[in-house]
Amino acid sequence: MARKAYSEEDRVQVRNALMTTMIQCIADRGLIHSSIDVLCRKVGISKTFFYSFFSSKEELVLYALRYQQPKLLDYARSLMEDPGLSWRAGVETFLKNCCYGAKSGVAVLSIEEEQQVRHCLSEENFQAFRRDQIIFYGKLLSIFS
């Protein structure tokens, strides 16, 4: 079987598809039930091609969580700017839809899943992710203030 040649634009689309598919899989089934095989099948690529983007499922999870951050910040902003919602109602809506299990397409890891991801990461990747999370939560708090 001949290999497909991917342009740089194709690679960007595949990478984005992997991240959005991972987010959806985590939101729908949780990380444990989100295998590389399932992701590759949904995106339409081989496992070999997957590994040209990410070294592991856990590395993809980090990138996917970063990838959804702008969407979450925009959502928080829209709630705070909604004249029909009080500050409290806006924050409660955000937490309900994004953190407490509402089926809103947002990837949220359980404590066990976070520990699994942490265990598989290099110290460098973990520290970089931790810095990104601190920045993200700072922006979120700024929106809610």
What is each PLM-predicted segment?
Residues M1-R29, D37-V38:
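Basic, helix-initiating cap at the start of DNA-binding domains
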Residues C25-E59, Y63:
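Helix-turn-helix
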Residues Y63, R77-S104:
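Hydrophobic alpha-helical connector segments
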Residues P70-L73, R77, C120-S145:
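Amphipathic alpha-helical packing segments from all-alpha helical-bundle domains
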Residues A89, G101-Q127:
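Amphipathic alpha-helical segments used for helix-helix packing
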